[in-house]
Amino acid sequence: MIIYRDCISQDEMFSDIYKITEVANGLCLEVEGKMVSRKEGEIDEALIGGNASADGPEDCTEATVITGVDIVMNHHLQETSFTKESYKKYIKDYMKSIKARLEESKPERVKPFMTGAAEQVKHILGNFKNYQFFVGENMNPDGMVGLLDFREDGVTPYMIFFKDGLEMEKC
């Protein structure tokens, strides 16, 4: 399994159990999720390879059911909010941080990143009202903000992450 971490906060943002597509000329990763309902404290068996029928009967106790997007719930992402103006300030500072990291580690990515990022930010601001914003579990204000939107069907959630702001970790 591959875990994708925010390169600034080191928070786990998502893993390769989801359908991942490069978008915006390879600048971003689009991660498709699904809406799920879980009892509070319950672990999704798909994540651990469990089999409920083999584990024996479950205790019947009242439990709180939580419904949400699997990417958000599985990786403990925290919702945050922005106005258009506050997002512009955040993204400007975030782009500077990523540019500095790229200059050190992958100088050949700086120009394509900065050019593509400007276009992507325009697209994000143009569709600003469609997005919900999520940060990693530690809620680092300098870290990556994932954008949650829904497909045209209104049912299928997907998140967008800047690829150059992620580190991959094999588990």
UniProtKB/Swiss-Prot annotation:
Record's GO cellular component terms: cytoplasm; extracellular region
An example molecular function term from Gene Ontology annotations: calcium ion binding
SUPFAM superfamilies, per the entry: Mss4-like
Keyword Protein transport annotated: no
Record Gene3D superfamilies: Metal Binding Protein, Guanine Nucleotide Exchange Factor, Chain A
Compartments where located: Secreted
Pfam family for this entry, one: TCTP
Highest taxon of the lineage: Eukaryota
Key words, A-Z: Secreted
Annotated S-S bridges: none
Tissue: Expressed by the venom gland.
Residue intervals of the TCTP domain: 1-171
Role: Venom protein that causes edema, enhances vascular permeability and is likely related to the inflammatory activity of the venom.
Family indicated by similarity: Belongs to the TCTP family.
Additional free-text comment from the UniProt record: Secretion of this protein from cells may proceed via an ER/Golgi-independent pathway, probably mediated by secreted vesicles called exosomes.
Name under which the protein is recorded: Translationally-controlled tumor protein homolog
